[in-house]
């Protein structure tokens, strides 16, 4: 069963490339195990929020910034592994 990863990002801020980069990296890490969807906001929000199985695990608005370091990526990997174990 695929784990749903949802990314809400600021479309008006031009964050789509950051979303696509994260999507590819996650797909490479978990081939055929994830259902990844992205939603760009039409207005300026500053969002880059990542939800794993409905739970917020990364929030730019909450102070996490972008998923731009290995430690931030590994935090997502850990959340996905936990969700896969429960599925």
Swiss-Prot record:
InterPro entries: Selenoprotein_Rdx-typ (IPR011893), SelW_related (IPR051441), Thioredoxin-like_sf (IPR036249). Induction: Up-regulated by dietary selenium. It is found in: Cytoplasm. Keywords: Antioxidant, Cytoplasm, Glutathionylation, Redox-active center, Selenocysteine. GO terms for cellular component: cytosol. The modification S-glutathionyl cysteine is found at residue 37. GO terms for biological process: erythrocyte differentiation; response to lipopolysaccharide; response to stress. Detected in muscle, heart, tongue, brain, lung, spleen, kidney and liver. Highest levels expressed in muscle and heart whereas lowest levels detected in liver (at protein level). It comes from the Eukaryota. GO terms for molecular function: antioxidant activity. There is a cross-link at residues 10-13 (Cysteinyl-selenocysteine (Cys-Sec)). It holds the Pfam family Rdx. Belongs to the SelWTH family. Selenoprotein W subfamily. Interacts with DPYSL2, PRDX1, YWHAB, YWHAG, HSP70 and HSP90. Plays a role as a glutathione (GSH)-dependent antioxidant. May be involved in a redox-related process. May play a role in the myopathies of selenium deficiency. NCBIfam families: CXXU_selWTH. This is Selenoprotein W. It comes from Ovis aries.
């Amino acid at each position: 069963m695929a784990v749903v990863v949802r990314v809400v990002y600021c479309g008006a801020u031009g964050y789509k490339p950051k979303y696509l980069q994260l999507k590819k990296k996650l797909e490479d890490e978990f081939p055929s195990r994830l259902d990844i969807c992205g939603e760009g906001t039409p207005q300026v929000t500053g969002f880059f929020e990542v939800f794993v199985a409905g739970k917020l695990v990364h929030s730019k608005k909450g102070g996490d910034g972008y998923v731009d370091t290995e430690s931030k990526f590994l935090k997502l990997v850990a959340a996905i592994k936990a969700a896969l174990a429960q599925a």
